[in-house]
Amino acid sequence: MEKNIEIKNLCKVYGNITILDDINFVAKEGRVTAFLGPNGAGKSSTLRILLGLDQATSGSATISGINYKDIRNPLFVVGATFDGLGSPSDRTVYQHLRIVAASNGIEKSRIDAVLAVTDIAHKKNESIGHLSLGETQRVSLATALLGNPQFLILDEPTNGLDPSGIRWLRNFLKEQSEKGKTILLSSHILSEVEAVTDDVVFIHKGKIIANGELKKIMKDTVSLEEVFFNLIQEGGKEDEVIL
């Protein structure tokens, strides 16, 4: 089975408000797919459904054809950064990772490995509450990597990172995709992911307005921001989706 993430005919309605309107896209194995749009566009709602944290009104969001809730030992399959660390502020970074590893049957040796990969080992004895936002992002990523998963689902991974941290993240994502990982990341800051993404999915007001390879979507434009605003001005209709 292909190691893809597939969002198919996904709809989410709260009362009489449509949050997601027939969302369709695929994040492919060995590629970085950037899920882009302004705050409130529907990115987090889509990821919440994908990770089993919310239910769709209709449609599906699957990982290798399986719903997240049906995956056995999910941390070995999917690593996600979403909704913070979920640990007490006085717990150290190492304690946090040790608890997550132990509760999921992950070998202790993986802790030092992910601390090294995310360049946060020097903070392992620091309390989580004393970390900067960028450092917390690195710990979230280290947590996601504990099970050495095939899939990485990252919600706004550049938040809180300084320029050197963003450069590091870009290199990290490139290395992981070259290893064959399937990476889906969301962001509302288009310029920060442009250098690392292979495929782009634009969402606006709950609808996909463009979807395809970065080089095809960019064409003769100078930036993803320009592409996005051009699409908005043109109306972003479904028949304008780029494949």
Identify the meaning behind each predicted range:
Residues 59-74:
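Conserved ABC transporter NBD signature motif
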Residues 98, 102, 108-123:
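Conserved ABC ATPase "signature" region
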Residues 152-156:
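Catalytic Walker B motif of ABC-type/P-loop ATPase nucleotide-binding domains
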Residues 193-195:
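A short, surface-exposed alpha-helical micro-motif characterized by mixed small hydrophobic
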Residues 211-212:
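ABC ATPase "signature
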